[in-house]
Amino acid sequence: MRAGHETETSIMRPQYPGDDIRPTSKKELAGWYSYGWAAEVFTVCAMGSFLPITLEQMARDRGVLFSDKVTPCSATLNGPSRMSIQARWTLSSRYDAGRPTVANQCVVYIFGVEINTASFAMYTFSVSVFIQAILIISMSGAADHGSHRKLLLMAFAVIGSVSTMLFLGVVPKIYMVGAVIAIIANTCFGASFVLLNSFLPLLVRHHPSVLRSAREPRPALDDSRAQEGHSDTTNGIEHGIESNVTSPLLHARQGNGENAEADMHPATHITVSQELKVSTRISSFGIGIGYIGAIILQIVCILVVIATNQTTYSLRLVLFLIGLWWFIFSIPAALWLRSRPGPPLATTHHGKHTRSWIGYMAYSWKSLYRTAVRTRHLKDILLFLAAWLLLSDGIATVSGTAVLFAKTQLNMQPAALGLINVIAMVAGVLGAFSWGSFSRVFNLSASQTIIACILLFELVPLYGLLGFIPAIKSLGFLGLQQPWEMFPLGIVYGLVMGGLSSYCRSFFGELIPPGNEAAFYALYAITDKGSSIFGPTIVGIITDRYGEIRPAFVFLAILIFLPLPLMLLVDVERGKRDALALAAELQPSGAQTYGTLPTNEDRAPPSEL
């Protein structure tokens, strides 16, 4: 086995000082999977279920009724943190005779401004996403260059997990501290996952099977075999639940010029196909194991909430468990994941390395600017990114809005809200596998499948708007008037998410100029992360204006519909032609030979994040 590793290593030579060319080991892969198992629970169990309702409930415990602005929302001799949430909802229901209206809505005053308790949670998420986007851009240079990647990953993991555990000590009296902790935890989670995904191309490139394929004889492929390999890869992506991968999967060897990917071994159809197969397999398994862990912990959290009588303390306790899970299962990643240092930054004109944090941050923002300038010449990428910005904002906003709507207007208890999330996750996994079969049966292209997902997604807010129609409202059900209606909508939401996660990223990859995957996927990730600033903020403003969340469904319906005409304008073939033309313009006159280190004079300015 050792001899085999030596042979595989011998076909690669370090490209820069500190370059780790050891083949990817099973233990290293286990470390990478372990962090997905550890951290995925935060986005699914915390952000998707218990964190929004915890923030809302703590604010509610300190708020007053919207109807009279005087009566406390929670009044008890035993203290609000231990009073049963079900009991509090029963008390509030006396104002609305069992029918959800604005009467049981609560407001708090922050710096003299009246804010609905549901809006409080939405504003908190908007702030966290804004900080997260700034942080992701600023740290990308340090993550991709030098030896900081693993250090940053573990630092964000520790800060994020410990912050989540600190919710155990946050009582309603200091609910603003809870908002600050939520912002820190969500920011650290997003940053850590971007860092985790940046390991993926390195694990793939040094995977033993990829190294073996690079060493094997490379016969010329005819068109039919090349097409067959491409088809296999596409099917793998369609069926692989490949979501949230925000780093390049092919030859992202950065730092030795704009097209540093060419510095690797000569690109062939065999090598590219093998790398795509390996990357799809690793990515899919990582996402799958993360969801399995999240489902397990979500069920545990539901049982804990029920066993502790569904109090505010119950919500804080499950957040502590989520943070503890995140912390404990990050330890194998810290032990087994190799640092895999990246290439050093380009030198300055004075010959001094810009390795300070200020230098890394400046490099990151300049790289983003260069990528944005390039995008101006690619009409179809611009159209798709605009559609994706709106669509990803809609995805994130609908999730948070639905949870808060179910709690504040349908009076659903935390255990039931957690169960909805489990159902949505299971439906998402099924959707990721079923959309591929659906598209083949109806002979749909990738863009047409995305459009079908958008149309199905549009049904969610439209169904909520049915509650405004007097004839339906008089029935007492339909139009989200009863708690049970949330469960089928959760299935629809999960199916849509499964389809979009399987298709959007792979569709975007078809439009990227070859050799520039790193920069454009970074732009894709920033569009994804940063878009969620606006939706929750607007929903919060609408809720504050009308005193309830239901009117926000009008905004959500518009937000989900807007990507539809943009996707209809995207021309894949035109996008591919434009991408190839731009790649030809960016192709340097000479590429650095694999295995050699360029001098300062020979090194082209880096352009990728």
Curated annotation (Swiss-Prot):
Transmembrane region(s): 35-55, 117-137, 151-171, 176-196, 287-307, 317-337, 381-401, 415-435, 450-470, 477-497, 522-542, 552-572
Keywords of the record: Amino-acid transport, Autophagy, Glycoprotein, Membrane, Transmembrane, Transmembrane helix, Transport, Vacuole
UniProt region (Disordered), positions on chain: 214-240
GO-annotated cellular components: vacuolar membrane
InterPro entries membership: Atg22, Atg22-like, ATG22/LtaA_families, MFS_trans_sf
Main location: membrane
Subcellular location: Vacuole membrane
Keyword Transmembrane helix: yes
Job of this protein: Vacuolar effluxer which mediate the efflux of amino acids resulting from autophagic degradation. The release of autophagic amino acids allows the maintenance of protein synthesis and viability during nitrogen starvation.
Family: Belongs to the ATG22 family.
PANTHER family, alphabetized: AUTOPHAGY-RELATED PROTEIN 22
Name of this protein: Autophagy-related protein 22-1
Provenance organism: Aspergillus fumigatus (strain ATCC MYA-4609 / CBS 101355 / FGSC A1100 / Af293)
Lineage: Eukaryota, Fungi, Dikarya, Ascomycota, Pezizomycotina
